[in-house]
Amino acid sequence: MSFSSDEVNFLVYRYLQESGFLHSAYVFGIESHISQSNINGALVPPAALLTILQKGLLYTEVEWSVGEDGEVARPIEGLSLIDAVMPEVKPLKPIVKTEPGKPGAVDSSAPAGGNQNNNAKPEIKIEPGTGVAGSAGGNKIAGSTTGTSTPTDQSASEVDSSGNAANNAGGTYAGNNGAGGNQASTGGSNSTSTPAGGDLAAPGASQKKSQNSNEAGSSSSGNAGNANATSTDDAASSTSTNGNSSTSSSVEQPTSGLTPAGGTVSTSNPDAAASGGASTATGSKAPSGAVTIRVGAQGNNVQSGSSNAQSSAPSGTISSSTSGGAGTPAALVPMDIDENIEIPESKARVLRGHESEVFICAWNPSRDLLASGSGDSTARIWDMSDANTNSNQLVLRHCIQKGGAEVPSNKDVTSLDWNCDGSLLATGSYDGYARIWKTDGRLASTLGQHKGPIFALKWNKCGNYILSAGVDKTTIIWDASTGQCTQQFAFHSAPALDVDWQTNQAFASCSTDQRIHVCRLGVNEPIKTFKGHTNEVNAIKWCPQGQLLASCSDDMTLKIWSMNRDRCCHDLQAHSKEIYTIKWSPTGPGTNNPNTNLILASASFDSTVRLWDVERGSCIHTLTKHTEPVYSVAFSPDGKHLASGSFDKCVHIWSTQTGQLVHSYKGTGGIFEVCWNSKGTKVGASASDGSVFVLDLRKF
């Protein structure tokens, strides 16, 4: 028997990721040089460390139960992990298992000479099948006699071969534009998607999408790399609380000072905004008393709460509010989906080909071509036209030069975007390169200037510039025709998570440094800087008119900014966990739907989606059918419907006018991204199990 420190470090690294400690995993991966090991993370099963620890405990129990003569002296059961590593702590009396509802027994495994407590310790109950909001993982967990939860019944649809529980970034880190979309985040909400056994991404970066918060995110397969993308200090400053990317099991304690899920929306004046923003900072974790751990049947999210936890009583499907989203916690508990609105399998086309999580997908604006980006270091273009029934795919392999030859980069493709006429596709990868592809799959140009993973990438409306954001704390405007860097902006003090164009030459960027900068091509300083968030900012979006900027953060707030004011116009507080992404409706003045009111949608790790009337600063509808973190929302072209995708594997289609759920489909993996085609007839979705699927809504 032999093992190396590299092997131990890798198992610890993977354990931290799977447990939702994305920030710790990121820093540990850098300091232990995980990226330099020769371990193939794709071959290591999930919960490997817990499995080997459990086997070690069982061996120790057997060893202690057998006397020196080889005869069974006394059975040892329920040995704790700490006692097992203390040879001098051998039980003096037989251990009596404490059963629920029975008087506590003396724990004879307590250290010798220590004070014995005749009161049995509170039992941690594992309740399989209980859905827990906020879980991003896909594993089912069963309790063991050692009190350790280990994944069981791991299907490919729930946990991929790389051990990804599917951030970021959230978390937050899975690229906002894609999985990274907020992507690498702890999962940080947009969480930065942190690859398990894959690339090391700064928590809170775009791969947050794989990313999420304390509920951490999906990992991508491949050798952990990019460890030198940021220094350890940078990593610390860039970590997010939602792990964006980030969707694995999480253990939470009641948080003090947090706004309940049915909280209120405060419309702040310039002065009140600052104080309001500060007041939304995440409160300190408070210890809980008797603890119940519930394990969701569809995820390995573990939520620990005290007796004053939110009620789980049944409630209606929608909680409408005209007073800023105020409501009761019970109103946010999801109900079963009505079978009448379920989309049948015959109306869904499942596209197989990717070999790892698919973080991002986007429709071509002119044709029924669906692009997808994955942790298998490829992007793919799927022909979804009615004439093509075979779902032909073009594979866009992301390669790098090594030793004079082109080899696969083995890095996640976390962001992608079509240009305005659909003739070119831009992709961003964890290998630090952006690439431009033609619709026939040919590589047009490679854009190399970032020093680390790219978390977000966008074309401007004219199609002459591409904007990118990376872990190197910079944003870059690229000349699309030449592939050259036109201007690099280095104003953030931590990884940049998302970008969005305001005009063809001006844009906004957000970062884990809690700042939002508005910059313009040719100007060497930000033309505006917005401050007010108290945690990393996962996503930003300009309204269709380019007048208002919306931002969402791990501080659980949604803020609306105007270039005419230094402080936020609205500080919307209603979500009870990190907000991963936001989208404006394609309605209002200057759009194709000028007679429909402008609304804003927000998706959160609290498993809800909220629709906001931005003019009034109030929550119109709270959509509560999801049971896991929601990573993506998308409006139909006419603004009448909203699609949402969650790690509960469901894509829901909602009416934006009534807030009612009108269609629903359950896939085989946690959903990272949803998108509508230009005609509003099809919805595409990408999932953690490597699948991509298209829902045809024309029949309904």
UniProtKB/Swiss-Prot annotation:
InterPro entries with a match to the protein in the record: Ebi-like (IPR045183), G-protein_beta_WD-40_rep (IPR020472), LisH (IPR006594), Quinoprotein_ADH-like_sf (IPR011047), WD40/YVTN_repeat-like_dom_sf (IPR015943), WD40_repeat_CS (IPR019775), WD40_rpt (IPR001680)
Sequence ranges of Polar residues compositional bias: 142-160, 251-270
Entry annotated with the keyword Repeat: yes
Domain LisH: 4-36
Location in the cell: Nucleus
Record's compositionally biased regions (Low complexity): 161-198, 212-250, 272-287
Main location: nucleus
One GO BP annotation of this record: response to oxidative stress
Tissues where this protein is expressed: Widely expressed both in embryos and larvae.
CDD domains linked: WD40
Residue pairs linked by disulfide bridges in the UniProt entry: none
Stored PROSITE patterns: LISH (PS50896), WD_REPEATS_1 (PS00678), WD_REPEATS_2 (PS50082), WD_REPEATS_REGION (PS50294)
Coiled coil: none
Region (Disordered): 93-287, 299-331
Gene3D superfamilies: 1.20.960.30, YVTN repeat-like/Quinoprotein amine dehydrogenase (2.130.10.10)
Listed GO CC annotations: histone deacetylase complex; nucleus; polytene chromosome; transcription repressor complex
Sorted UniProt keywords: Cell cycle, Nucleus, Repeat, Sensory transduction, Ubl conjugation pathway, Vision, WD repeat
Keyword match tRNA processing: no
Protein family (similarity comment): Belongs to the WD repeat EBI family.
Description of its domains: The F-box-like domain is related to the F-box domain, and apparently displays the same function as component of ubiquitin E3 ligase complexes.
Subunit record text: Component of some E3 complex at least composed of sina, ebi and phyl, required for the degradation of ttk. Probably forms a E3 complex with sno, required for the degradation of some component of the Su(H) repressor complex. Interacts with sno and Su(H) and Smr.
Function summary: F-box-like component of E3 ubiquitin ligase complexes; involved in R7 photoreceptor cell differentiation, cone cell development and neuronal cell cycle control. E3 ubiquitin ligase complexes mediate ubiquitination and subsequent proteasomal degradation of target proteins. Required for specification of R7 photoreceptor cell fate in the eye by participating in the ubiquitination and subsequent proteasomal degradation of Tramtrack (ttk), a general inhibitor of photoreceptor differentiation.
PANTHER family assigned: F-BOX-LIKE_WD REPEAT-CONTAINING PROTEIN EBI, WD40 REPEAT PROTEIN
Miscellaneous comment text of the record: 'Ebi' means 'shrimp' in Japanese.
Protein name: F-box-like/WD repeat-containing protein ebi
Organism per entry: Drosophila melanogaster (Fruit fly)
Gene: ebi
